[in-house]
Protein backbone atom coordinates (compact mmCIF):
# COMPACT_ATOMS: atom_id res chain seq x y z
CA UNK A 1 0.00 0.00 0.00
CA UNK A 2 1.66 3.22 -1.20
CA UNK A 3 0.91 6.45 0.64
CA UNK A 4 1.81 10.08 -0.05
CA UNK A 5 4.28 11.60 2.42
CA UNK A 6 5.61 15.14 2.81
CA UNK A 7 9.31 15.83 3.30
CA UNK A 8 10.28 18.79 5.48
CA UNK A 9 13.70 20.41 5.84
CA UNK A 10 15.26 19.66 9.23
CA UNK A 11 17.03 23.04 9.39
CA UNK A 12 14.27 25.51 8.48
CA UNK A 13 11.15 23.30 8.77
CA UNK A 14 9.78 24.20 5.33
CA UNK A 15 7.85 21.41 3.59
CA UNK A 16 9.46 21.25 0.16
CA UNK A 17 8.72 17.83 -1.34
CA UNK A 18 5.89 15.32 -1.68
CA UNK A 19 6.71 11.70 -2.50
CA UNK A 20 5.25 8.22 -2.06
CA UNK A 21 6.44 5.30 0.01
CA UNK A 22 5.45 1.72 0.61
CA UNK A 23 4.39 1.41 4.26
CA UNK A 24 4.81 -2.36 4.27
CA UNK A 25 8.50 -2.32 3.30
CA UNK A 26 9.40 1.04 4.95
CA UNK A 27 7.38 1.43 8.17
CA UNK A 28 9.80 3.98 9.68
CA UNK A 29 10.06 7.63 8.63
CA UNK A 30 12.22 8.24 5.59
CA UNK A 31 15.12 10.69 5.50
CA UNK A 32 17.00 11.90 2.43
CA UNK A 33 19.22 14.76 1.38
CA UNK A 34 17.39 17.20 -0.89
CA UNK A 35 17.84 20.80 -1.97
CA UNK A 36 16.14 23.44 0.21
CA UNK A 37 15.22 26.60 -1.71
CA UNK A 38 15.04 28.73 1.43
CA UNK A 39 18.54 27.75 2.64
CA UNK A 40 19.85 27.40 -0.95
CA UNK A 41 21.82 24.24 -0.09
CA UNK A 42 21.39 20.49 0.28
CA UNK A 43 19.95 19.58 3.68
CA UNK A 44 18.45 16.53 5.32
CA UNK A 45 14.69 16.25 4.72
CA UNK A 46 12.55 14.09 7.01
CA UNK A 47 9.05 12.68 6.56
CA UNK A 48 6.32 14.62 8.38
CA UNK A 49 2.73 13.77 9.17
Swiss-Prot record:
The keyword Ribonucleoprotein applies. One of its GO terms (cellular component) is ribosome. GO terms for molecular function: structural constituent of ribosome. PROSITE patterns: RIBOSOMAL_L33. HAMAP family: Ribosomal_bL33. This is Large ribosomal subunit protein bL33A. Keywords: Ribonucleoprotein, Ribosomal protein. Belongs to the bacterial ribosomal protein bL33 family. It holds the Pfam family Ribosomal_L33.
